[in-house]
């Protein structure tokens, strides 16, 4: 599967170049999925691509996006930026909006202490500290609505989730993972008076 997410302020598309596959950002997903069954096949196509700044309609600006592409074995993130086209291995298999993927992935280092297990008292052997709630191994997991925090949260959720044995259990688990980063109407107001929401 493949998805494009908002990448405002970072996406840079080029003018068409001879000898390259000049693809508009709105054509990118069907162009890849129409020709590739695996991420490896997509890597071959991406070696010749030039994402161009063609608008879908003169009424709308070009959508600034970055993409995640995944098959059952691996995932990559694709970003067209000022320096060129960056293709990153995506070991967590998730993506949110800004910042660029390499920064999002690096930020996971700040949360290496998180665990699905109950924590052990390392504060002091002289104190008898109590575990007063389940889930305390994940204390410090970001809960705000910024893209960077949502990336950490969904990466932790996905990497530690356990699916059941049936298809319906796996589908249910998938939607629980997505729910960990859902935007609720009213919690993130935009400058134009509208709200950032998850549909």
Residue ranges of model-derived segments:
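A contiguous strand-loop segment
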Residues: 1-20, 48, 53
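Peripheral peptide segments
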Residues: 8, 13-17, 74, 83-84, ...
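Proteins synthesized as precursors that undergo proteolytic processing into mature forms
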Residues: 19-55, 163-178
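Short, contiguous, pocket-lining structural segments
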Residues: 20, 34, 57-61, 68, ...
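Aromatic- and glycine-enriched pocket-lining scaffold segments that form the walls
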Residues: 39, 43-80
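C-terminus-biased signal that marks the final domain/tail of proteins
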Residues: 54-55, 62-63, 71-74, 96-199
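Aromatic/basic-lined ligand-recognition segments
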Residues: 75-84, 89-91
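A short, polar/proline- and glycine-enriched secondary-structure boundary/capping micro-motif
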Residues: 11-16, 87-92, 98-99
């Amino acid at each position: 599967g493949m998805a494009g997410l908002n990448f405002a302020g970072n996406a840079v598309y080029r003018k068409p170049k001879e000898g390259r596959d000049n693809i508009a950002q709105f054509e990118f997903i069907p162009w890849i999925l129409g020709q590739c069954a695996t991420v490896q096949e997509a890597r071959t196509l991406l070696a010749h691509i030039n994402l161009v700044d063609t608008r879908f309609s003169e009424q709308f600006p070009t959508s600034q996006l970055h993409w995640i592409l995944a098959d059952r074995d691996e995932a990559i993130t694709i970003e067209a930026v000022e320096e060129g086209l960056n293709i990153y291995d995506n070991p967590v298999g998730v993506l949110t909006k800004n910042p660029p993927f390499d920064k999002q992935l690096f930020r996971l280092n700040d949360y290496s202490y998180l665990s699905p297990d109950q924590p052990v008292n390392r504060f002091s052997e002289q104190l008898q500290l109590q575990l007063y709630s389940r889930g305390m191994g994940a204390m410090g997991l970001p809960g705000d609505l910024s893209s960077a925090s949502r990336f950490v949260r969904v990466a932790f959720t996905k990497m530690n989730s356990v699916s059941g044995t049936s298809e319906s259990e796996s589908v249910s688990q998938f939607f629980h993972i997505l729910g960990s980063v859902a935007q609720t109407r009213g919690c993130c107001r935009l400058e134009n008076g509208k709200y950032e929401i998850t549909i």
